[in-house]
A protein has these predicted regions:
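Metallo-beta-lactamase
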Residues: 3, 11-80
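Binuclear metal-dependent phosphoesterase catalytic core
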Residues: 54, 99-100
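Short, electropositive alpha-helical surface patch
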Residues: 78-99
Length: 100
């Protein structure tokens, strides 16, 4: 776990090892891909400077931008394969190669 601040005071992100390498679960540090990809903080922020520093930290902790998973982006469900046929549209495998 790594403290990033930004959206709320005390916010943390998780760095996890997968078969693809180091991934970062951004949780609320980045709601959407566009937030960290385009360096676009969202409106409800405790401290903008901490949020921007959090984007830099995520980039440094993850093996690539494709290894950062935002907390609320529906695109996650499109960019990663389902955990199983029965879980299609419900659960995806973040350790699998992305579909994009």
């Amino acid at each position: 776990l790594h403290y990033v601040g930004g959206h709320t005071h005390g916010l943390q992100i998780a760095r996890v090892w997968t078969r693809r390498g180091w991934m970062v679960l951004a949780v609320d540090a980045s709601h959407y891909y566009m937030n960290f990809e385009d360096i676009r903080p969202y409106k409800t922020v405790h401290h903008v400077g901490d949020m921007l520093e959090g984007y830099r930290l995520m980039a440094g902790l993850a093996d690539s931008p494709k290894h950062i998973i935002p907390g609320h982006d529906p695109l996650v469900m499109e960019r990663y394969p389902a955990a199983s046929k029965e879980m299609d549209g419900i659960v995806v495998r973040l350790d699998a190669d992305p579909l994009y």
